[in-house]
Amino acid sequence: MIRLVLVDDQPSVRQGLRMRLTVEPDMTVVGEASNGREAMILVQQLAPDIVLMDVQMAEMDGIEATAEMRASTPQSAVVMLSISDDVSTRARAHAAGAAAFVHKSGAIELLLATIRQAAQHR
């Protein structure tokens, strides 16, 4: 079972992801956070397999949180989610240690495949 933490400052995005991911037989959502700081605490407590992390958030953005998370909790892989698809954002996410980067408007099948692949390679 792939254990996930969802991190996004929009409750509707977290709710939509949770509803879609929990119907997958090999996935379970174990926690949710609305910013990078909350995510850091949850990841240290729950040690999920995958963290689905939004890029743009208040308090601590997803890229900064990913860099700190990779240093403190390397067993959890981070899959970045963003509405922005520019090369610079992707490069910063990968430099911070993200396992993958998925555009929010992409097909759910791509996100599911990315989660499964990141879980296998973490």
Cite the ranges covered by each PLM segment.
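Acidic, metal-coordinating helix/loop segments flanking the phosphotransfer/catalytic sites
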Residues: 32-50
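Active-site residues of response regulator receiver
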Residues: 8, 54, 82
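Short amphipathic alpha-helix used as the core "switch/output" element in two-component signaling
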Residues: 41, 63-74
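C-terminal output helix
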Residues: 88, 106-119
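A short, hydrophobic beta-strand element within the central beta-sheet of small alpha/beta folds
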Residues: 75-85
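The feature encodes the CheY-like receiver
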Residues: 58, 86
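Acidic catalytic/metal-coordinating carboxylates
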Residues: 35-38, 60-64
